[in-house]
Amino acid sequence: MDERVKEAIFRQVGKEPFAKKFGLQLVELGAGYSKVEMTFTPDMENLFGMAHGGALFALIDEAFETASNSHGTLAVALNLNTTYVSSPAPGSRLTAEAREFSRTNKTANYDIRVTDDKGTLIASCQALVYRKGSPLPFL
């Protein structure tokens, strides 16, 4: 992976308002791979006291966004198909890992899995991006 791209993505995530709001932390980044973490806090609960799907989706999307843009080419989401498997315990540290499993000049596909700090599968997602062909604007 190009170190300039890696540094730029880490820098952008560090100042992204949405990532700050949810406490999303980019911890690993490689070509077609990303690991993002967050802590499940009480303000992320739904009306049943469980993890809100939107909070989990935010974690998934951040891993997807960073993995799909790791090649230095601007990539935007086309489709995400998410399955929520279980609800994490309050205070759990959650990890989303996005792995690229196919890429062409125009599209790329990713498998994203969310686990808690005990290794329990919380959610899984298959996602598709459109690769615009232009470099990342913040390089």
Predicted regions and their residues:
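Terminal targeting signals and extreme-terminal segments of soluble enzymes
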Residues: 1-139
